[in-house]
Structures are given as structure tokens and as C-alpha cells.
Amino acid sequence: MIPLRVRVPASTANVGPGFDSVGIALSLYLEVSVKEEADKWQVIHSFDDSIPKDDKNLIVSTACKVCPSLSPHIIEVTSNIPLTRGLGSSASAIVAGIELANQLGNLYLTTDQKVQIATNFEGHPDNVAASILGGTVIGALDGKNVSVVRIESKELGVISLIPNEELNTDESRSVLPEMFPFHEAVKASAISNVLVAALCQKKWEVVGEMMERDHFHEPYRLELVPLLPSIRKCAKEFGAYGTALSGAGPSIFILTPYEKRKEIADQLARVFAAMKVCELEIDHKGITVNKEEHIGL
């Protein structure tokens, strides 16, 4: 068979008030290399024992749901995306599984179909659409219909502060209210609208202001990520546009002028030495496939 390698970027979601809607692809990657066919699925990886090495692996189980007739293969998975840190590790695995099915099953899926399938698995389009399309995405899931718009943000630099502690998405969602007062929803929605407009018009100072004024989720998650206010204050003093939780946390996501990202990252690393400070870039390619013939790309 033709050697096949699937590469999927990490992602950050929400960007403050764009809850379950806005996502940005990041320069951390999950890679899946497909080896030979086998009697049963085998996943070679160096992660801990909590990550399955058989057909229960999220990549494989997703692929088999998309294409139940898929022949088992041996695959090797590598990733520098931290697990359960709010950087889209599960979304990248889902996207990789869909592309694995697309390639091995000769499905010829369009990009829109991949986004639709991935959103159905994930429940919201922000992370998965960013990983598929690259760049910055704004998406909405209305019933079964997914709408996504992609925009370029090449002028932006990204810094991620990653703590040692894990935070499960279900735990982080459990602190959110089941009901939201109407007046709060109006206020939160207006801020989100301005965030999206500012992203589209490249008004980065406004983007930074809006991403720090979320009402949908961050006020409720502060108890789980108590360092957010102090990181936000320091980042602004060092020249960043804005700071927000990365997805459900616990990682912190900071937007900066592209040319200042290293300087700001170095300053933050000195202040918050207990956290891993990563100077990243926005990934503008999205999912890529290394193969002589690309299918559905």
C-alpha cells in the first residue's frame, strides 16, 4: 500500500466569549502513520496505559464508526498535544479518525462533510473545524446542521501556559449553570458578536478586549483555574492583546502581536515558572495527508 501519514493540528476553543463556536488551530500536532493491514487493529504509541492500543482507541473507534467495513491496520500515533489541558487533544483524535476512514475506505469526503461528521461526534464545531480547516473558525451547530466560516489571522502570535495539572472537560463543564438569565445572555452574546466582528476586521486591540469580557463560562471556571486573572494582568502589561481560558482549561491562551510573541513568552516564563510556557503559531493548513494521491482534500 502507499505509505500514509495523517497530521492534525491542536486547537484552542472559545477565545473568551465565543463559547462552543470560535476555534483557532495551533502549531502542535497529532500524527498517525498507517502501517500494514492486520487481523485486528493495533495502535503503537508511547502514551500512558490509559490510552487504548486496540480498537477502543478514539482514533480507531471513530474511523470504524465512519466506515464500519474498514480493514484493520497497524497504526503508529505520535503527538505533542498535551492531554486534557484544553488544547483539543480529543478533537484532533476524532479528526484523525475521520481522515483515516476517508483514506483507507476511499470515501472521498468533502471538507464540509468532514466538519459535519466531526461536529456530530464532538457536539460543537469549534475545535474540530479548526483542526480540519486551519486558521480561525467561527461555527454554529443548529440541530443537525453545521455552518462554519474560516478567516485568516496571520498577524497574530499565540502563547499557551500549560499547568502540570489535568482538567477533564466533563469536570470543567459541570460547574457551568444549566440555565442562563435572559439579560446575561443578551450581554454575553453582544460581546461575542463584537469579538467575531473584530476578528474579521483584524482589530486586534478590540479582539483582546472582548476575549477578556466573557460571561458564558469563564466566571464559573475561575475556581478551577485561579491563576487566570494574574496571568491576564501580566500578559497585558507585557504587550499581549488578550488572555482567555483555552477551551475548558486548565491551559491559558494568549494572543499577541506576531513579532512580540517570543519576548512576551520569555517574560511570562520568568513570572510563572511552575507552568510550561509555549510560544506557538496559528496553523493555517489544517489537516494534511502525506500520500501520493490525496482523497477528498
Curated annotation (Swiss-Prot):
GO biological process: threonine biosynthetic process
Any single Gene Ontology cellular-component annotation: cytoplasm
Gene3D superfamilies, sorted: 3.30.230.10, GHMP kinase, C-terminal domain
Highest taxon listed in the record's lineage: Bacteria
Record localization: Cytoplasm
EC top class named in words: transferase
Function recorded in the entry: Catalyzes the ATP-dependent phosphorylation of L-homoserine to L-homoserine phosphate.
Family statement: Belongs to the GHMP kinase family. Homoserine kinase subfamily.
The protein's name in its UniProt record: Homoserine kinase
